[in-house]
C-alpha cells in the first residue's frame, strides 16, 4: 500500500484563541473541525483542526482544568527541550520561489518576524514562529531530488541562527 502523507499533526497550546487567530488570520489556514471535549476526570479540552492544503491538517489542543495537565508549560517545543530553533519545525509548501517571496512579504505586512529567504541548494525557505513559540517554515523545492541527494554526506557549513529566529 502506498504512503499517503500525513492525516494531521497534533500540537498543544496554552491559548487556543490566540493560536486560532494566528493560523486563520495570519497564515490563512481554514479551521475545518472544532471540538470541546469534556474530560471524565474533570475539565475540558478545546481542539481545532486547520487545513494546511491537500487535506493535510494541523491540530491544536488546549487543556482547561484537566487533572495531570499543568496550567502552564512551554508549548514551544524547541524552547521546552532547550535545543536550537531549527531542530523541531513544521514546513508548509509555498509552491514556487515567487510564491515564497510573496508569502514572506504577506507575513511581514501582518507583523510577523520572518527570516530572509534561505537557499538550501535543493529548496528555499523562510522561517518564523507562531504565538506558541513553534518554529514554522514555508518552503519550495528548487529542483528535483536525485539518488545523490539520498546519500548522507557533508554538503555545507550552516549557521543555526540563519535557519531560525532567536
Mark where each language-model region is:
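N-terminal beta-strand motif that seeds the catalytic metal site of vicinal oxygen chelate
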Residues: 1-18, 43, 87-92, 144-166
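Alpha-helix termination/capping residues and helix-transition junctions
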Residues: 3, 26, 84, 109-111
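Vicinal oxygen chelate
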Residues: 5-14, 49-52, 71-166
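Core segments of cupin and vicinal oxygen chelate
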Residues: 12-63
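Short Gly/Pro-enriched turn/cap motifs at secondary-structure boundaries
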Residues: 38-39, 81, 116-117
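Acetyl-CoA-dependent GNAT
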Residues: 62-65, 141
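A short, polar/proline- and glycine-enriched secondary-structure boundary/capping micro-motif
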Residues: 69-74, 147-149
Amino acid at each position: 500500500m502506498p504512503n499517503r502523507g500525513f492525516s494531521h499533526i497534533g500540537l498543544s497550546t496554552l491559548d487556543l484563541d490566540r493560536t486560532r487567530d494566528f493560523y486563520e488570520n495570519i497564515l490563512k489556514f481554514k479551521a475545518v473541525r472544532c471540538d470541546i471535549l469534556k474530560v471524565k476526570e474533570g475539565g475540558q479540552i478545546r481542539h481545532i483542526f486547520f487545513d494546511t492544503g491537500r487535506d493535510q491538517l494541523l491540530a491544536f489542543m488546549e487543556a482547561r482544568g484537566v487533572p495531570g495537565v499543568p496550567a502552564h508549560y512551554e508549548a514551544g517545543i524547541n524552547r521546552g527541550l532547550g535545543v536550537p530553533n531549527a531542530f523541531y519545525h513544521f514546513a508548509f509548501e509555498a509552491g514556487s520561489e515567487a510564491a515564497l517571496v510573496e508569502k514572506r512579504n504577506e507575513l511581514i505586512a501582518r507583523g510577523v518576524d520572518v527570516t530572509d529567504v534561505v537557499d538550501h541548494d535543493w529548496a528555499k525557505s523562510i522561517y518564523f514562529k507562531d504565538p506558541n513559540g513553534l518554529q514554522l517554515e514555508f518552503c519550495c523545492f528548487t529542483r528535483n531530488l536525485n539518488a545523490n541527494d539520498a546519500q548522507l554526506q557533508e554538503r555545507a557549513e550552516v549557521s543555526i541562527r540563519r535557519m531560525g529566529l532567536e
